[in-house]
A protein has these predicted regions:
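Polynucleotide-recognition surfaces of large bacterial nucleic-acid defense/processing enzymes
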Residues: 1-22, 44, 67-69, 117-212
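SAM-dependent methyltransferase catalytic-core segment centered on the flexible catalytic loop
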Residues: 1-75, 80-84, 93-103
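A sequence-level detector of short, solvent-exposed, charge-rich linear segments
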Residues: 21-28, 92, 109-113, 122, ...
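Amphipathic helix/helix-loop-helix segment enriched in hydrophobic residues with interspersed Lys/Arg
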Residues: 37-38, 103-109, 114-115, 121
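Phenylalanine-focused residue identity feature
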Residues: 51, 58, 75, 90, ...
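Short alpha-helical segments and helix-capping/turn motifs at coil-helix boundaries
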Residues: 61, 87-89, 119-123
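Active-site proximal loops enriched in glycine and acidic residues that flank catalytic Cys/His/Asp
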Residues: 77-79, 105-107, 140, 156-158
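Flexible, glycine-rich phosphate/dinucleotide-binding loops
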Residues: 82, 110-112, 145, 161
Length: 212
């Protein structure tokens, strides 16, 4: 049985052509699993990002691991899922399928501007990625020892840090046990950070909702 999967999944939802290195490939069975879990648990009307390759990697890895033995997934990936509204179903599924979750938010979102861009700091992969990056560790206990609720632990690397600053902090930390973890209590919308207050739901929609 497979008990540990470690990797750096590709990100391909923004692929511009078939000549791009990270091609969008069709995996019907995997896509259906995503539809049955991450999409089914979402309230978002825009689910395109849920079929990104790095999200597919999470689904694939989760389904490959042995439920009897207990297992761990450790990925460094696009971190947009942490607070993306369209990723609420993904976050909800992680809570159901794992007993402990550790998210080390390395920030670095280059698709921002002004003061927010400065706060995001440098990208871990430099010019290789414009997305925010996160290290995620998912722990699932063996059958019979599963917890009734998932413990979610979050650590933000900090504001205004250069790429070199971030790499130095990661190297100095050495182990996840040394980080000062914040325990996250998701709200009813399955927000983990930057939680919404529900005011938006009181507004009248301009067009009917539909799934894309």
């Amino acid at each position: 049985p497979i008990r540990v999967i470690i990797g750096n999944p590709p990100y391909s939802i923004g692929q511009k052509s078939a000549n791009d290195n990270a091609q969008n490939q069709s995996y019907p069975i995997l896509d259906q699993r995503i539809a049955d879990t991450y999409v089914a648990g979402s309230t978002s009307t825009n689910t395109k990002g849920i079929y990104d390759s790095y999200i597919k990697a999470f689904r694939w890895a989760t389904d490959r691991l042995s439920p009897k033995e207990g297992s761990v997934i450790a990925f460094i990936s696009n971190g947009a899922w942490i607070d993306g509204n369209s990723h609420d179903g993904f976050r909800a599924s992680l809570q159901k399928e794992f007993d402990k979750i550790y998210v080390y938010d390395l920030r670095g979102n280059a698709r921002t501007s002004g003061e927010l861009r400065k706060r995001e700091g440098g990208g871990i992969f430099d010019s290789g990625s414009r997305t925010p990056i996160a290290i995620t560790i998912l722990v699932r206990y063996p059958e019979g020892k599963r917890s009734d609720s998932c413990q979610i632990h979050y650590h933000d690397i900090g504001d205004y840090l250069s790429r070199e600053d971030k790499l130095r902090l990661i190297k100095q930390t050495k182990t996840y046990r040394r980080l000062d973890w914040e325990t996250i209590m998701p709200n009813e919308k399955n927000d983990w950070i930057n939680q919404r207050d529900g005011f938006f739901d009181t507004l009248l929609p301009l067009v009917p909702e539909k799934k894309y």
